[in-house]
Amino acid sequence: MTSQLHKKGEAWSARFSEPMSELVKRYTSSVFFDKRLALVDIAGSLAHANMLAAQKIISADDLAAIERGMAQIKGEIERGEFEWQLDLEDVHLNIEARLTALIGDAGKRLHTGRSRNDQVATDIRLWLRGEIDRIGGLLNDLRGALIDLAEQNADTIMPGFTHLQVAQPVTFGHHLLAYVEMFTRDAERMRDCRTRVNRLPLGAAALAGTSYSIDRHAVAKTLGFDGICANSLDAVSDRDFAIEFTAASALVMTHVSRFSEELVLWMSPRVGFIDIADRFCTGSSIMPQKKNPDVPELARGKTGRVNGHLMALLTLMKGQPLAYNKDNQEDKEPLFDTVDTVADTLRIFAEMAAGITVKPDAMRAAALQGFSTATDLADYLVKRGLPFRDAHEAVAHAVKICDDRGIDLADLTLDEMKQELPNVAHLIGDDVFGYLTLEGSVASRNHPGGTAPDQVRAAVKAARAALAK
């Protein structure tokens, strides 16, 4: 009687009396997206094989054959010659089947002491660790581009906004450094997340560990992990590290989206603070004059995509009992797409930021509107002994008068200012007008974290030093 092993293609098929439905086969197969893990799968398998040989679980000849076969498979994959088969379900069984075809029984011994449960968990962690490092580098590129732009605009004055209303003058360099701070925290979160990603699940087997005398710490060292997952059930079943990475990525994209919103506003003709290089914009098929900031607009949209992946992964895990469940196959596509989206976005934003053209005159003209130095006038009165709330009320009255007349505070003569503010007239002198200039306003915020040009230059220096670490 022909054995089930010869009749069925699946590695687990001996237990079953009928072949898998073609519909189910397509529904459950993951090979056409998890093949992305092929090279880390090979790396994990080689580390596992070396440990098995060191522990005398397989022979030195078996190890040599496995290494030789894996080298050939790796080459086939890199050259695009490897034939992926739907019938073999996933990346792991495709590679194992090819290995066995190349080297015979030695290939069948590779899976000793291992399950696909701990194998895939190891693959994902290996792959994600490398992607975190890549994204960290891209965050640094964007930070560097923004730092350069901030340094060039340490003295460029623009309006600062609250509620999208003109609030106080700031320097454009100071404004850009706010985003540098955000992306710096993003980089810190990625590094912190990496510490929890960088634990080895291999050795947990299906869920309970293995009866073989394995050396998990040796495998961890070979693969560059900081240590091993301490509990076999947890090692194969949880994907909190993927959720944590996706949450950190959602914050990256949130910061990109905020920056994008401002770029779109700043580039609009009604604002005209900046121009984005043509290579990052598109036109209209009907309106010849259009130059559209499609890149930042699309980044805003892609932020929702990454947020959706975070919700998908959280929902994926919320109802799973221990240990591994097939639900976890659904972790990869959201994770892969999150990595692709974040990496592509950061790469293009670093290049786009370096090509921004700043329009200082437009920024200055906007800062002169909306009574942006009103707080400075209140501070002037406070420094002459008036309680702040009284100063606030007096200046608000002056703003109302100027608004009705269609002029700015700085347009009032000294006599007019005293006349309109009789209760504080004795506190107002010729020096008041120095407080009402844009330059005087920003220069007065001369403390760490302030918008004064000297502080911006100091912050640029500190940001560069942090980036170099």
UniProtKB/Swiss-Prot annotation:
Localization of this protein: Cytoplasm
EC number, as in UniProt: 4.3.2.1
InterPro entries linked to this entry: Arg_succ_lyase_C, Argininosuccinate_lyase, Fumarase/histidase_N, Fumarate_lyase_CS, Fumarate_lyase_fam, Fumarate_lyase_N, L-Aspartase-like
GO biological process, one term: arginine biosynthetic process via ornithine
A Pfam family of this chain: ASL_C2
Functional pathway: Amino-acid biosynthesis; L-arginine biosynthesis; L-arginine from L-ornithine and carbamoyl phosphate: step 3/3
Location (main, coarse): cytoplasm
Record's keyword terms, sorted: Amino-acid biosynthesis, Arginine biosynthesis, Cytoplasm, Lyase
GO CC entries: cytosol
Catalyzed reactions: 2-(N(omega)-L-arginino)succinate = fumarate + L-arginine
Entry GO MF terms: argininosuccinate lyase activity
Family designation: Belongs to the lyase 1 family. Argininosuccinate lyase subfamily.
PANTHER family named among the record's database cross-references: ARGININOSUCCINATE LYASE
Name recorded for this polypeptide: Argininosuccinate lyase
Organism: Burkholderia orbicola (strain MC0-3)
Lineage summary: Bacteria, Pseudomonadati, Pseudomonadota, Betaproteobacteria, Burkholderiales
